[in-house]
Amino acid sequence: MSSYDALASSYDGLMADGSYRKRADWLERLFRKSRIPVHSVLDLACGTGTIACLLAQRGYEVIATDGSEEMLTQAVGKAAALYGRPPLFLHQAMPRLRLIEPVDTVVSTLDSLNYLTRESDIRETFRRVYRWLKPGGQFIFDVNSPYKLERMDGQMYMDETEDSFCVWRTFFSHRTQVCTYQVDLFRLNGEGTWDRDFEEHRERAWSEAQLRQFLAEAGFQTVTVTGDLTMKSPRADEDRWIFRAEKGE
């Protein structure tokens, strides 16, 4: 089973504290730093499409890709309620990104890039993002920091809604720098009993130096890194980093 196949229908309820509007506001603030006007946006690994839909509502022409068909099903349903032009959703894994024409900006939020656990995949993803960015465009993404993922070793977390209950168990390997999430999801069915699903998620802890190297190899010239939703450099105990990489004109 692919990551988020079972969780897709419950994801929005379980992740209700994702601060999506605040993140969309922050993305727009970074759009204003672009050397070219931002009209078209690619949301890479869009999940259930919340950020993509918020940006579409604000007038951007949005393409959104994800590797999970189940997550995209939720995204398409969400977009159907929008006024105006909805995002164009495409079923694509990040290292297989392919568009019809370049876009002004590429975004990827909520640690999607951490799910690329192999160097070959993250390098290919950065190369393809660079390929499909217009000259002068920017690539904005966030990652969970090594500090955060290392601290998650041996932890257990629980989320619940009215009709679902989720237990996350996390384990971090210092050898592979991979944090494994074992997820048990219980959902209330029509008969008043609970159905159980299990998924395993894996996130790689990439260092700032590694990500800067991969971006430079892909062709990006200017890279800035800040803490989460701030213009300041990351603290040593920062949980999330935001990268902004620019393509030369």
Predicted feature locations:
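Residues lining the SAM
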Residues: 109-111
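SAM-dependent methyltransferase
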Residues: 140-213
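Conserved class I S-adenosyl-L-methionine
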Residues: 1-39
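Class I SAM-dependent methyltransferase SAM/SAH-binding core
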Residues: 42, 50-96
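A short glycine-rich, Lys/Arg-flanked "PGG" loop and its adjoining helix->strand segment in the class I
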Residues: 123-135
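C-terminal lobe and adjacent flexible extensions of AdoMet/dcAdoMet transferase-like proteins
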Residues: 202-249
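A short acidic, Gly/Pro-enriched loop at the edge of an enzyme's catalytic core
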Residues: 98-105
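Conserved S-adenosyl-L-methionine
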Residues: 45
